[in-house]
Amino acid sequence: MEKINDKMAKLTIKRLSPEEEFPDLSQHNNHMAKVLTQDMYTKLRDRATPNGFTIDGVIQTGIDNPGHPFIMTVGCVAGDEETYEVFKELLDPIIEDRHGGYKPTDKHKTDLNPDNLKGGDDLDPNYVISSRVRTGRSIRGFCLPPHCSRGERRGVEKMSVEALDSLSGDLKGKYYALKNMTDAEQQQLIDDHFLFDKPVSPLLLASGMARDWPDGRGIWHNDTKTFLVWVNEEDHLRVISMQKGGNMKEVFNRFCTGLTKIETLFKDKGTSFMWNEHLGYVLTCPSNLGTGLRAGVHVKIPNISKHAKFEEVLKRLRLQKRGTGGVDTAAVGGTFDISNADRLGFSEVELVQMVVDGVKLLVEMEKKLEKGQSIDDLMPAQK
């Protein structure tokens, strides 16, 4: 028995040479595969963050998921706050590529003052079905979902629920742990677009974020279900403000108020969110760095969405389209989820402004096409 214990103490990860371990990325279309070379892999392979996260943990999801039909995926994740520094040779070029030339020396800006948003309360409700703003936050001192332990995940849940239970007024609400829900209750919340999906997404599974499901996961929402917080899905926290119709101003107002209150409640508990002046708010996926903000509307645009210039219009407006049910879905009945393409290098107010102005223009184009008119005079300049 002593011999076995002695052997266990000396156990190290058995790996072959970097050449033999380097993944085959020849069929891949994601940001990680564009950047990672064998030389870089060799250089980064023997590094680990203080929590033991390695380059193989960073890239696994991008190896297992070569590409995506709708969007160019990032193909990597962070396991902790230090990942972005320890593996910066890989992650800096990916961040620059994904975030429109954002340089390693650039500094991020934050603006959560809803008074700085112009308009936004007048999107046409005949076209705009619902409006939503979300972001993610990571709690300092814990590993991120791809690498956290069961105990850490439960610690994040406990701390979050204690903070959220202190919210009052129209933000007052209740926490619902996933493990206490029936399948029918879960499915109803998913169908109503309130809850994250069951862990079927290959991006979630391959990165290790679905371990121990549903332990430590849940949803907190206010009584009217217009302010929600997801706990321990892709990020420690996803903060969401949403409602039916086109009043993005109201949605953003609630978002800023609630988010600021939550941050204060965490500070009162002696902890803070992961943030630095270069990357802004640090989150699991490099695509969400900076603001972590996605302002989206479900909008009925059956005509413009079939137009030859639709993709070009979106690109110029710095907008992204998704299917009706989110990132892995197709559009139903010409209804698309239209949101800001950027997260980093722009402030929260600037991103919501782009969505408000851009969606207004898309609705204007849709109305012209309904009448059989040309939209050439409405073509926007590149933002």
From Swiss-Prot:
Q: Which GO terms describe its biological process?
A: phosphocreatine biosynthetic process
Q: EC number(s) in its UniProt entry?
A: 2.7.3.2
Q: Where is the Phosphagen kinase C-terminal domain?
A: 127-369
Q: Which InterPro entries match?
A: ATP-guanido_PTrfase, ATP-guanido_PTrfase_AS, ATP-guanido_PTrfase_cat, ATP-guanido_PTrfase_N, ATP-guanido_PTrfase_N_sf, Gln_synth/guanido_kin_cat_dom
| The family this protein is said to belong to | Belongs to the ATP:guanido phosphotransferase family.
Annotated organism of origin? Oncorhynchus mykiss
State the taxonomy lineage: Eukaryota, Metazoa, Chordata, Craniata, Vertebrata
- The annotated regions of Basic and acidic residues compositional bias extend over 99-112
Tissue specificity of this protein: Exists in many tissues, but preferentially in testis.
Q: Name one GO molecular function term.
A: ATP binding
Q: Which UniProt keywords apply?
A: ATP-binding, Kinase, Nucleotide-binding, Transferase
| CDD domains associated with the record | creatine_kinase_like
Catalytic activity reported: creatine + ATP = N-phosphocreatine + ADP + H(+)
Tell me the domain of life: Eukaryota
What residues bind ATP, as annotated?
130-134, 193, 238, 294, 322-327, 337
A Pfam family name for this chain?
ATP-gua_Ptrans
Top-level EC class as recorded in UniProt: transferase
Xref: PROSITE patterns = PHOSPHAGEN_KINASE (PS00112), PHOSPHAGEN_KINASE_C (PS51510), PHOSPHAGEN_KINASE_N (PS51509)
Q: Where is this region: Disordered?
A: 99-119
- Write the protein's name: Creatine kinase, testis isozyme
Cite the Phosphagen kinase N-terminal domain residue spans from the record.
14-100
